[in-house]
Curated annotation (Swiss-Prot):
GO terms for biological process: cell division. The gene is crgA. It is found in: Cell membrane. The chain crosses the membrane at residues 31-51, 70-90. Belongs to the CrgA family. Its main location: membrane. GO terms for cellular component: plasma membrane. Pfam families: CrgA (PF06781). The lineage of its organism: Bacteria, Bacillati, Actinomycetota, Actinomycetes, Mycobacteriales. It comes from the Bacteria. This is Cell division protein CrgA. The keyword Secreted does not apply. NCBIfam families: PRK00159.1.
Length: 93
């Protein structure tokens, strides 16, 4: 009786599935986006400077009387502009 051939055993291992996130390639941000977040940060800075230099005290001009009436809310408004601009920088490519 003829002898049968012995087949080589291939060790087949299942490769683990790669679960690494795929980064989506995004193009560069447009010019208006950069101007927007820089503008928001500058508006906040100017708001804070105008409040500190011109709208505080009894010598405040009549045009800035409304700003003096806001009182400490001026800090919140100025920092809200600046933080919004800062948060937009995180979306900049």
């Amino acid at each position: 009786m003829p002898k049968s051939k012995v087949r080589k055993k291939n060790d087949f291992t299942v490769k683990p599935v790669s679960r690494t996130p795929v980064k989506v390639k995004v193009g560069p941000s447009s010019v208006w986006f950069v101007a927007l977040f820089i503008g928001l940060m500058l508006i906040g800075l100017v708001w804070l400077m105008v409040f500190q230099l011109a709208a505080v005290g009894s010598q405040a001009p009549a045009a800035l009387n409304w700003m003096a009436q806001l009182g400490p809310w001026n800090y919140a408004i100025a920092f809200a502009f600046m933080i919004t601009g800062l948060l937009l920088t995180m979306r900049w490519h």
